[in-house]
């Protein structure tokens, strides 16, 4: 039997599968697809799994099985299989305080993937509406999943984690396309490229025509590689003059970060680590311009603790600024009890004065707030951080101006995964700062996925990104995504580095999602116009 004959038999088995067999095929294909993401980056598996997705939708149009619901159900199983192994690490957060939250572990591991899989189901259903029995069905799937992934990233606060386009962000040469078309444009190309082998089983065409579509897909992949290689070559890492960074990664256990009685130990660890000598020529914190501590670093309100502020002032030499995460109380009348707070970044001068503050805008549902907060608290629910009333959201994203370094754009925790929220406009900063605490997720794939998505924001904007994480991975990333320096997951220490200089604003930085929107519109028009009957 020829290779095409074997492939055709496999495809026929998938197309004709029904009931539980069809669900299992979709589930396994989705699970295998998760290996395309960090830390595995085994994206060639998508050359297997996305053709299976095409054949599953082919099967929903076979005989009496015709219909959108059949495609949607296949999409749901594919998405569920994709998100469970891709997001399993979220369950670790529910074990930090196991006595309170362990009972919610099944909901975290299965409930969130079940919800996110609804968007994959929507993508398959939309693809089925646009379906036709020729090579254009590849584009139908690509544009439909791009739309559904965009919706996943925006509806109900949005969660674009592990969008399919992230499969083509490693190696770094492939990721450079994101500087033009963003993650949503890259998602469209990713699905189209990897789904293309599905047409090899199509009948009624000669061998040359059958191979034309995969050949074009490989051509796009080659063009992305060439473009990325040229961009990397033309953008060597350059450093800003007279700016030295020190990132402190304390690797504190989660319970210490929320235990007020541990405040003295926490401060002592921060102070000693920050002034650690890293070599025979190092003089500790006196060598640095910017000392950087991670997200919500203290088990207390920093600005209300005079002793802690005095210790920071004593630590910092003249000309050094501390950038640190901290929980910030709102301004209240005297005597009013504090019940809510902001998740913030402080810039603190050598005399202990607060130079500027940024309050986190995009809060984490169920981590920093609960939907219908008051009602949920009345029936006994609390979010993971146990802040009564939930955290407050900031008013607007703004640059932090510094006396000894270029202005920075602050991003706290998973704010770095939302590309279109980094609206820089005319007030372009010199770099981006991402403070996070991935210690919630243990030694798992979660922190690596978070790092990779933050790297893409650097490439999109042409700006360096500096990342300080409680347990890692802390890193200094140049404007084309190179990791200049890093401190690994689960490591205690400090990371010294220069500050990479930005490159010219990218196309994405100038026009945002416009190229991706144009690409989606053109593909949609091509699919719709070709569906019209002759003479219409």
Swiss-Prot record:
The catalytic site is made up of 295 (proton acceptor), 360, 413 (nucleophile)
Specify the domain of life of the species encoding this protein: Bacteria
Q: Which PROSITE patterns does the record associate with it?
A: CN_HYDROLASE (PS50263)
The signal peptide here is: none
Q: Which GO terms describe its cellular component?
A: plasma membrane
Q: Which UniProt keywords apply?
A: Acyltransferase, Cell inner membrane, Cell membrane, Membrane, Transferase, Transmembrane, Transmembrane helix
Locate the transmembrane regions by residue number. Answer: 10-30, 42-62, 76-96, 107-127, 136-158, 181-201, 212-232, 509-529
The annotated pathway is: Protein modification; lipoprotein biosynthesis (N-acyl transfer)
InterPro entries in the record = Apolipo_AcylTrfase, C-N_Hydrolase, C-N_Hydrolase_sf, LNT_N
Domain CN hydrolase span(s) in chain numbering: 248-501
**Similarity remark:** Belongs to the CN hydrolase family. Apolipoprotein N-acyltransferase subfamily.
Q: What is this protein called?
A: Apolipoprotein N-acyltransferase
Gene name tied to this protein: lnt
């Amino acid at each position: 039997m020829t290779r095409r004959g074997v492939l055709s038999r496999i495809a026929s088995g998938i197309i004709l599968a029904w009931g539980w067999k069809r669900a299992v095929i979709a589930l396994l294909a989705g699970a295998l697809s998760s290996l395309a993401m960090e830390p595995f980056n085994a994206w060639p598996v998508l050359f297997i799994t996305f053709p299976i997705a095409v054949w599953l939708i082919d099967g929903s149009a076979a005989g009496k099985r015709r219909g959108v619901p059949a495609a949607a159900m296949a999409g749901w199983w594919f998405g569920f299989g994709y998100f469970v192994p891709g997001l399993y690490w979220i369950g670790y957060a529910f074990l930090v305080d196991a006595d309170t939250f362990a009972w919610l572990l099944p909901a975290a591991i299965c409930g969130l993937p079940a919800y996110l899989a609804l968007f994959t189901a929507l993508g398959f259903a939309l693809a089925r509406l646009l379906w036709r029995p020729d090579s254009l069905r590849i584009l139908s799937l690509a544009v439909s999943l791009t739309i559904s992934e965009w919706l996943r990233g925006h509806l109900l606060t949005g969660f674009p984690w592990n969008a399919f386009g992230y499969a083509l962000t490693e190696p770094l040469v492939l990721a450079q396309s994101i500087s033009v078309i963003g993650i949503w444009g890259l998602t469209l190309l990713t699905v189209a490229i990897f789904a293309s082998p599905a047409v090899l089983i199509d009948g009624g065409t000669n061998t040359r025509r059958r191979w034309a579509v995969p050949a074009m897909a490989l051509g796009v992949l080659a063009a992305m590689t060439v473009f990325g290689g040229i961009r990397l070559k033309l953008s060597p890492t350059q450093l800003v003059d007279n700016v030295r960074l020190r990132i402190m990664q304390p690797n504190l256990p989660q319970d210490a970060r929320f235990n007020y009685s541990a405040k003295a130990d926490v401060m002592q660890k921060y102070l000693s680590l920050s002034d650690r000598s890293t070599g025979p020529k190092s003089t500790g914190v006196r060598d640095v311009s910017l000392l950087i501590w991670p997200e919500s670093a203290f088990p207390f309100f920093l600005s209300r603790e005079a002793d802690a502020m005095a210790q920071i002032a004593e630590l910092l030499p003249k000309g050094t600024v501390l950038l640190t995460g901290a929980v910030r109380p709102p301004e209240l009348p005297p005597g009013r009890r504090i019940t809510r707070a902001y998740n913030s970044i402080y810039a603190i001068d050598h005399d202990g004065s607060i130079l500027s503050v940024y309050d986190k805008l995009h809060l984490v549902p169920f981590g920093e707030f609960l939907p219908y907060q008051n009602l949920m608290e009345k029936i006994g629910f609390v979010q993971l951080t146990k802040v009564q009333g939930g955290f407050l959201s900031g008013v607007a994203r703004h640059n932090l101006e510094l006396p000894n370094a270029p202005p920075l754009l602050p991003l706290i925790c998973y704010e770095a995964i939302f590309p279109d929220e980094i609206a820089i406009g005319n007030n372009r900063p010199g770099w981006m700062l991402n403070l996070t605490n991935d210690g919630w997720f243990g030694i798992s794939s979660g922190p690596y996925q978070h790092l990779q998505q933050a790297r893409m924001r650097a490439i999109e904007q042409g700006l360096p990104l500096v990342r300080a994480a409680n347990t890692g991975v802390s890193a200094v990333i140049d404007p084309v995504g190179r990791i200049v320096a890093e401190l690994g997951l689960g490591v205690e220490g400090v990371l010294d580095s220069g500050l990479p200089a930005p490159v010219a604003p990218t196309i994405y930085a100038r026009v945002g999602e416009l190229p991706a929107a144009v690409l989606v519109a053109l593909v949609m028009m091509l699919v719709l116009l070709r569906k019209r009957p002759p003479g219409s």
